[in-house]
Each structure stands twice: as structure tokens, then as C-alpha cells.
Curated annotation (Swiss-Prot):
Catalytic activity: (S)-4-hydroxy-2-oxopentanoate = acetaldehyde + pyruvate; (S)-4-hydroxy-2-oxohexanoate = propanal + pyruvate
Temperature dependence, free-text field: Has a half-life of 42 hours at 50 degrees Celsius. When TTHB246 is in complex with TTHB247, its half-life is reduced by approximately 30 hours.
Coiled coil: none
GO biological process annotation, one example: L-leucine biosynthetic process
Protein name: 4-hydroxy-2-oxovalerate aldolase
Subunit and partners: Homodimer. Can also form a heterotetramer composed of two aldolase (TTHB246) and two dehydrogenase (TTHB247) subunits. Upon complex formation, the aldolase shows a 5-fold increase in substrate affinity, while the dehydrogenase shows a 3-fold decrease; the kcat values of each enzyme are reduced by 2-fold when they are in a complex.
Function according to Swiss-Prot or TrEMBL: Catalyzes the retro-aldol cleavage of both 4-hydroxy-2-oxopentanoate (HOPA) and 4-hydroxy-2-oxohexanoate (HOHA) to pyruvate and acetaldehyde or propanaldehyde, respectively. The aldehydes produced by this reaction are directly channeled to the dehydrogenase TTHB247, ensuring that these toxic aldehydes are sequestered from cellular components. Is involved in the meta-cleavage pathway for the degradation of aromatic compounds. Appears to be stereospecific since it can cleave (4S)-4-hydroxy-2-oxopentanoate but not the (4R) isomer.
The enzyme's E.C. designation: 4.1.3.39, 4.1.3.43
Site (Transition state stabilizer): R19
Binding annotation for Mn(2+): D20, H201, H203
Domain Pyruvate carboxyltransferase: 11-262
Organism of origin: Thermus thermophilus (strain ATCC 27634 / DSM 579 / HB8)
Length: 347
């Protein structure tokens, strides 16, 4: 399926290698790695660099995974490194609080991206209020946007706009969307919002991160996300260096240096990667079943420990419509599957 990009405009590009990529990196970034990545991104012309635990400010915990380096140290290091790019952080209400947001502002963030489930925009009101009170650029994330129709998401986006969001994102957290899904959802937000810009955040579980991003741009998306080498949860995100090349070929380059990004992906990010995310057996299952992308490594680890196929765990989580914050379901489902298997063998 082709999309008409004739009315699309060069997007604002946000890199989230140091946030979404933290999932793939098991939250083990060092200050030195953060500085090297930030410098390369800054020199290549990205608008903003998102830095925090993969699950946002305050996410370092037993449930979500402990950070090797305090996220405030990483934020401070990135802010000291960049010359042009803004520094952003993610915040999930219920995980991050005013305390973490205030500390992040003191460490140097200029933007906060406030993420809720796509059905729960109403819980973000006070967080947008705090962001504006602290002088931050405020962005809303409607996570797991594949789970609801465009018109429903438009209503949720209007709530965030009313709370003060400067941008509201359609977020394909499960990498479950087809291009027409991305197009329809972005289009609905563009028609519904009077002031706020519209963004799109892709995951590559079905191999469609770049394609869906182009569909979003065809629908009028103003902002898009990417990561170096696609380093992120599940099968990763839209690879920034690939996106830059595609945007340049389409006449939509917002000022990114394609060759600096290619070098950054190869020579800066390459040696840092724990592994190269791609649509493997379990990642495709996440996109197919519509499961939150960050569940992938947890399911692989628990499956290995208990001798349960991660694919079975992920498919069952999809059937139960598990969402972010329900990581404890992974162990529960795995134990239930193991018990069921043992019962079948006993019979």
C-alpha cells in the first residue's frame, strides 16, 4: 500500500535511544555511553533526546528492572554534552511523581513526555499542570493505541490538549499496527485537535516501523520518534539512520545529517548494543497478539527459568489484553501455563 506524501511536511524528530533503548539495554547505560550517544545525535541535528529509565522517571525497581546508573546522572551528562538538542524525559503517572519530575528539571530536562494507557488520559491532568508550572514543553503519549478506534483516541487526545499538552502522540506500544491503522489514528487526531501537534511512535514487531511512520506523516503527523539501530523494546523502534535516509529521499528531511547518523549507528551504537532488535519469533508474536513491547525480555527470562515457551506466554498475555504496569502478569501466566502442562502430563 502506498501513501501520498505530497502534503506531508518535514517532521520534528525525537530520538529515544536513551529511553526506549534502555529496555533493550536492560537499563544498564553508563554515563560514558550516554555522552557518546548524545553527542552523535546532537551533531546530527535531532530536535530532542529522551533520557530516562525505559519505564520513565522513577522506573528503576524490582518490577521494571533496576538501572545501573541513576537516571538523573544520565540526564545531567546528556544536558552537559548537547549544544542544540533539547533534553526530554518520559513520565508515567503512577510510576513517576512530582519529586522525580522536579529532580529531572534540576538535572536539565526541558521537555517531559507524559504517557498513559490510551483509555486513561484523564489521569494525566495534574502531571501536565506540573509540567507547565515547571516551564517544560509537554507531550502526551497515548500508549497501546492499537487497542481503541480512531474516534475514541481523538477524545482522549482532546483531554490531553485541554490539560496543556503541546503535542499528543499515537503510540504503537505493541508494534501491532498496519499502515492504515497508523494513518487513521493520526488523521483522527489532526482533525480533532485545535492547538496541539500530533506525533507518532512506532515499534517494529511486525517489521512496519518505517512504513507506519510514513503512513503517519501522510496523515499529517508533526512529530515522529526513532532510535539509533532501532534499539528499543520488542523488535525495537524505527531506526533513526534509516528514517533519516528515507525522509531525505522523500524531500522531508528536517535537517538531519544522514551520513553522521549512519556513522553514529555503526561506530557509536554498534559497539554498545547488547543485541540487535529485530522481528524474531517472539517479537512478531508481540505484534501479532498486541502485547506491550517491553514484556519481551521479561517473558524470555521467565520462560527460560520455568521451562515455559515465551511464545505461549506472550500469546496468552495478548488474549488477556495485558498493558503497561501489569508486568507481574507475566510470571502469573507462566506459572499457570506450567501448571497446566504438568496436569496434562499427569493425565
Amino acid at each position: 500500500m502506498s501513501w501520498d506524501l505530497s502534503t506531508a511536511k518535514p517532521p520534528v524528530v525525537v530520538d529515544t535511544t536513551l529511553r526506549d533503548g534502555s529496555h533493550a539495554h536492560r537499563h544498564q547505560y553508563t554515563v560514558e555511553e550516554a555522552r557518546a550517544i548524545a553527542q552523535a545525535l546532537d551533531e546530527a541535528g535531532v530536535y530532542a533526546i529522551e533520557v530516562s529509565h525505559g519505564d520513565g522517571l522513577g522506573g528503576s525497581s524490582l518490577q521494571y528492572g533496576f538501572s545501573r546508573t541513576d537516571e538523573m546522572e544520565l540526564i545531567r551528562a546528556v544536558r552537559e554534552t548537547v549544544r542544540r538538542a533539547k533534553v526530554a524525559a518520559l513520565l508515567l503517572p503512577g510510576i513517576g511523581t512530582r519529586k522525580e519530575l522536579k529532580e529531572a528539571v534540576e538535572a536539565g530536562i526541558q521537555m517531559v513526555r507524559i504517557a498513559t494507557q490510551c483509555t486513561e488520559a484523564d489521569i494525566s491532568e495534574q502531571h501536565f499542570g506540573m509540567a507547565k508550572e515547571m516551564g517544560l514543553e509537554a507531550v502526551g503519549f497515548l500508549m497501546m493505541s492499537h487497542m481503541r478506534p480512531p474516534e475514541f483516541l481523538a477524545e482522549q487526545a482532546r483531554l490531553m490538549e485541554g490539560y496543556g499538552a503541546d503535542v499528543v502522540y499515537i503510540v504503537d506500544s505493541a508494534g501491532a499496527m498496519l499502515p492504515e491503522d497508523a494513518y487513521a489514528r493520526v488523521k483522527a487526531l489532526k482533525e480533532a485537535l485545535s492547538r496541539a501537534k500530533v506525533g507518532f511512535h512506532a515499534h517494529n514487531n511486525l517489521g512496519l516501523a518505517i512504513g507506519n511512520t510514513l503512513a503517519a506523516l501522510a496523515a499529517g503527523a508533526d512529530w515522529v520518534d526513532a532510535t539509533l539501530r532501532g534499539y528499543g523494546a520488542g523488535a525495537g523502534n524505527a531506526p533513526l539512520e534509516v528514517l533519516a535516509a528515507v525522509l531525505d529521499k522523500a524531500g522531508l528531511n528536517p535537517g538531519l545529517d544522514v551520513f553522521k547518523l549512519l556513522d553514529a549507528a555503526e561506530y557509536v551504537m554498534g559497539p554498545i548494543l547488547h543485541f540487535q532488535p529485530y522481528p524474531d519469533r517472539d517479537s512478531v508474536a508481540i505484534g501479532y497478539a498486541g502485547v506491550y513491547s517491553t514484556f519481551l525480555l521479561h517473558a524470555k527470562r521467565i520462560g527460560k527459568e520455568l521451562g515455559v515457551d515465551p511464545l505461549a506466554i506472550l500469546l496468552e498475555l495478548g488474549r488477556r489484553q495485558a498493558v503497561a504496569g501489569q508486568e507481574d502478569w507475566i510470571l502469573r501466566v507462566a506459572l499457570e501455563l506450567k501448571e497446566k502442562e504438568a496436569g496434562a502430563l499427569a493425565d
